[in-house]
Amino acid sequence: IPAEPLFRSLESWREIGGKGMKLEDEWNQILSKKNEKIKIELKNFIYNSNFDKIQKIINDEKIKYYESKPSMATRQCSSLVIESISESMPQLIGGSADLSGSNNTKTKNSKVISSKNFNGNYIHYGVREHGMAAAMNGLALYSGLVPFGGTFLIFSDYCKPSIRLSALMGLNVIYIFSHDSIGLGEDGPTHQPIEQLSGLRSIPNLNVFRPADINETLECWEIALKSKNTPSVIALSRQKLPYINPSLKNENKCALGAYQVNLTSHESRVTLIASGSEVELALETQKELKENNIDSKVVSIPCHEIFDKQNEAYKNQILEPDNIIITIEAGSINCWNKYIGAKGLSLGIDKFGESAPYKEVYNHFNLTSNKIVNLVQKMLRN
């Protein structure tokens, strides 16, 4: 295919700028003729979100799911959150890079935006992750809109330049990345993210959330919506996960980045820290440790960036530095070593994945409760 040089690039750029100025003038003239009520309504739409209403919806949803305690993939959890808040938040503009059905970003409240109809709230971006992320930056820059867009976590690499600019410019953009680990199973190493979470967590001013159940998903979405000057990544599982929330509270447990899920004794000698799907594994490990007369504490850390900003007293309360600290995540361990101290251990995967049913892949990489218990027993003996 011949590549034609852009001889008129500067001229075309100026033409487009002139067209934009003309459209802006026309818009301002129309707005100037509207009554004050409409002007105030527009200003509120652009600058103010009705978080009181959103907060009530989220709290009501937390109560509902505390009663039913559903087991579901967190990509499904995220879809339920979007569905519950979208009608009360018209600023929310969703989309996906050709993976709406897999990311679960499109709900029954979604109305597709097309070239013939801009009166919608959902964009089919096609297979163009970088273009999607760039477009979301544009939507967030000056419009009052809160864009979110979905793809697989492995394809976040295609979004990376625009994610970096979201963070650099301090934009309220929400990236929905599903299929977040070896838990996706048979698709194998080409689709199993290993280094992606660690890489995303290294970007300044970017909150990377990895919720473990519906309660954490609701809370991570709440934080992301309120983060006016910080973009968010919400990494979600393909596989079903159990409900792990220990108690019903209106307060946001994820708001400090990490919290205690379960404690078998105040004399615990081991702290098990995990995120997302591995919180289930930590709880299974805790149960087996207790059967072997070893008390432990399970901590969920849905957001490193927020937890790292807490004071030392809270960090010590959560981590208990005198304990043997074991971190568990089905991905690169690079971003976990800061938590383990001198005698702890980070468990994860620092090689490419394998194609097999997901439980077999976890076993292959020694991420099972039985293997972790044996490891803890050996560490305690030493």
Functional labels for PLM-detected ranges:
Residues 88-92, 117-121, 142-146, 169-174, ...:
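Short coil/turn connectors at secondary-structure junctions
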Residues 75-84, 158-162, 218-222, 310-314:
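Short alpha-helical segments and helix-capping/turn motifs at coil-helix boundaries
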Residues 81-88, 95, 102, 135-142, ...:
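Generic, well-ordered alpha-helical scaffold segments in large soluble proteins
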Residues 2-128, 138, 271, 275, ...:
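Conserved acidic/glycine
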Residues 2-4, 93, 100-197, 217, 219, 226-382:
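Thiamine diphosphate
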Residues 3, 7-15, 141-144, 168-169, ...:
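Conserved thiamine diphosphate
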Residues 95-96, 125, 148-149, 175-177, ...:
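General beta-strand structural signal in soluble alpha/beta enzymes
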